[in-house]
């Protein structure tokens, strides 16, 4: 399983990165499968450096804040009006309840416009599982001001845990346990951001990974441009026993178990 960091800026696109978007790819029986985790503001442009968006097999939306879903409007335009490539049926989108209406509101101007001619929406459920080609996905409801999910993705012998946006919660333990890579929200800085129930800090992300047990790698993401990523890394390093990685736009990571 390959993970490509398309966008990793927190809360809004930054000067060097779009908002949240992560591309998973893997081969199965001679066919390349591609799944997106989130498609936030600015990410559709960057995605085209890595793959043809017309060839996606599914999109998983962690939640419906714009920095995680807004570019579905642009992808709808691409899939509807591309002069040379016809969309091959509707694209499966696994998302919290209400996603079709949410994206339709963003797409329309004077009124909500349907996007269900291009997308087939499936409502996520806590601990619910879906399979897309070689990817087995389990969704975990996490702690954020709106309905939000983390995803545990298994492909062959590799496991990725993506927290989406969350604060510390009980679901992080089964989400992260034994993962080859934890891709963790680190939007808050511990010494400054005292609000709870919204985001992890670097330290809280590391604490969750240690508590889960068996995590091989920890990568921090979703860092807003007003934060210094090295501060987030330093907070996590106080707890995490290994190297604390920082997600970088256009980075490609190959995942496999030892």
Where are these regions (language model features)?
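Hydrophobic packing residues within well-ordered alpha-helices of enzyme cores
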Residues: 47, 72-75, 103-106, 172, ...
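Active-site metal-binding motif and surrounding structural segment of the metallo-beta-lactamase
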Residues: 42-91, 178
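Conserved beta-strand hairpin/beta-sheet module of binuclear metal-dependent hydrolase folds
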Residues: 1-51, 148-164, 181
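Cap/insert and terminal regions of metallo-dependent hydrolase folds
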Residues: 168-257
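Structured loop/turn residues at beta-strand edges in well-structured enzyme cores
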Residues: 51-54, 89, 117, 133-135, ...
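Metallo-beta-lactamase
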Residues: 86-148, 155-156, 249, 255
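Active-site neighborhood of phospho(di)ester-bond hydrolases with catalytic His/Asp-centered motifs
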Residues: 36-40, 57-63, 67, 96, ...
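Adenine-nucleotide cofactor-binding loop residues
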Residues: 40, 143, 167
């Amino acid at each position: 399983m390959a993970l490509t960091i398309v966008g990793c800026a927190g809360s809004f696109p930054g000067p060097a990165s779009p908002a949240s978007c992560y591309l998973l790819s893997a081969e199965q029986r001679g066919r390349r499968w591609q799944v997106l985790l989130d498609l936030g503001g600015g990410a559709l442009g960057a995605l085209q450096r890595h793959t043809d968006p017309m060839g996606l097999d599914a999109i998983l939306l962690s939640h419906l804040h714009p920095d995680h879903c807004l570019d579905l409007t642009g992808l709808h335009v691409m899939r509807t009006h591309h002069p040379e490539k016809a969309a091959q049926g509707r694209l499966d989108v696994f998302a919290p309840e209400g996603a079709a209406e949410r994206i339709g509101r963003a797409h329309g101007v004077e009124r909500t416009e349907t996007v269900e001619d291009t997308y087939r929406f499936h409502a996520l459920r806590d601990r619910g599982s879906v399979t897309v080609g070689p990817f087995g996905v389990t969704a975990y409801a996490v702690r954020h001001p709106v309905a939000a999910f983390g995803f545990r993705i298994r492909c062959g012998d590799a496991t990725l845990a993506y927290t989406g946006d969350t604060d510390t919660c009980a679901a992080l333990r089964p989400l992260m346990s034994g993962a080859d890579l934890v891709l963790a929200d680190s939007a808050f800085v511990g010494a400054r951001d005292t609000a709870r129930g919204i985001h992890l800090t670097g330290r809280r992300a590391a604490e969750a990974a240690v508590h889960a047990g068996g995590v091989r790698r920890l990568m921090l993401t979703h860092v807003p441009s007003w934060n210094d990523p090295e501060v987030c890394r330093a907070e996590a390093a106080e707890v995490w026993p290994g190297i604390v990685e920082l997600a970088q736009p256009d980075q490609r990571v190959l995942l496999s178990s030892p």
